[in-house]
């Protein structure tokens, strides 16, 4: 009911504004004239309540379009850091004609479910460049796990060991934190002395700060979130939806 009343009030305000804007004597509306307009609006909306839904649908469309434009502007402004940062993890084809960027958190349940989508795209699309951005937003354990992950990447720039680490930690049971991340790193045969040294380096902090800066510029506050071409996709939308975005970026339509 409150939502309907808010919609009704918004509709009245919009119509009054339009009426005022179209009148050469807009500033001369008397209180009685405004009351009459409000009465007419109220009676019309009661007789045609579907107008409220139409108005809200149109508002949603405009807001979605405006948000998409903001995303495109931000992606263009930060394209180097998004797609070509020397700090980022790159999987797949480094010279691919479409870049697929994922922001994730090791304690994100939706990220765990979405990992197979990313791996399938990686396996099936030889022209896809995949970039992984650590975005630990779910507490101290997530930050610790991300710090270890950055150090893992510093030790293995090929991405092979990082991907092994990524899969094991993301699919493991319990909270991802420093202890679990270090256990995974040891299990896959990394140099633990070097890992400890790298974790203390300024590069780890700078890498995470870069991810948070990009996320802020794009208006991202949850995981998983994706940048595919000049589009932002929020949430675990599923393999087919991600494929469509990749295809749209590559050839201008959902299927190539």
Task: Give the positions of each predicted feature.
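The canonical Cys-X-X-Cys-His
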Residues: 108-112, 225-227
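A short beta-strand-turn-helix
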Residues: 80-98
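Structural alpha/beta surface segment adjacent to cysteine/selenocysteine redox centers
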Residues: 101, 112-186, 196, 216-221, ...
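Solvent-exposed coil/turn segments that connect beta secondary-structure elements
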Residues: 105-106, 135-136, 231, 238
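C-terminal cap of thioredoxin/glutaredoxin-like
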Residues: 4-8, 26-42, 62, 183-256
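N-terminal targeting signals for export/organelle localization
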Residues: 2-4, 13-80
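Extracytoplasmic/secreted proteins, especially bacterial periplasmic and envelope-associated proteins
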Residues: 36, 40, 47-54, 113, ...
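Short pre-active-site segment immediately N-terminal to redox-active cysteine/selenocysteine motifs
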Residues: 104-107, 222
């Amino acid at each position: 009911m409150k939502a309907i009343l808010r919609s009704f009030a918004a509709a009245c305000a919009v119509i009054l504004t339009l009426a005022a804007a179209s009148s050469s004597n807009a500033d001369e509306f008397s209180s009685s004239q405004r009351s009459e307009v409000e009465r007419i609006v109220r009676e019309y909306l009661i007789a045609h309540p579907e107008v409220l839904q139409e108005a809200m649908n149109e508002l949603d469309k405009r807001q979605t379009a405006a948000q998409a434009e903001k995303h495109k502007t931000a992606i263009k402004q930060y394209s180097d850091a998004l797609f070509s940062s020397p700090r980022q993890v790159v999987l797949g084809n480094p010279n691919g004609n479409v870049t697929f960027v994922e922001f994730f958190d090791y304690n994100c349940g939706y990220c765990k479910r979405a990992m197979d989508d990313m791996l399938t795209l990686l396996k099936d699309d030889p022209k896809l460049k995949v970039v992984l951005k650590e975005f630990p937003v779910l507490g101290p354990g997530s930050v610790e796990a991300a710090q270890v992950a950055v150090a893992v990447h510093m030790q293995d720039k090929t991405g092979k060991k990082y991907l092994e680490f990524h899969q094991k930690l993301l699919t493991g049971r319990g909270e991802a934190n420093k202890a679990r991340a270090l256990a995974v790193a040891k299990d896959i045969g990394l140099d633990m002395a070097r890992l400890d040294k790298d974790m203390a380096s300024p590069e780890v902090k700078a890498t995470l700060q870069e991810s948070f800066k990009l996320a802020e510029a794009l208006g991202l506050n949850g995981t998983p979130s994706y940048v595919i071409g000049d589009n932002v996709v929020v949430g675990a939308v599923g393999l087919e939806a991600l494929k469509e975005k990749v295809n749209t970026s590559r050839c201008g339509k959902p299927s190539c």
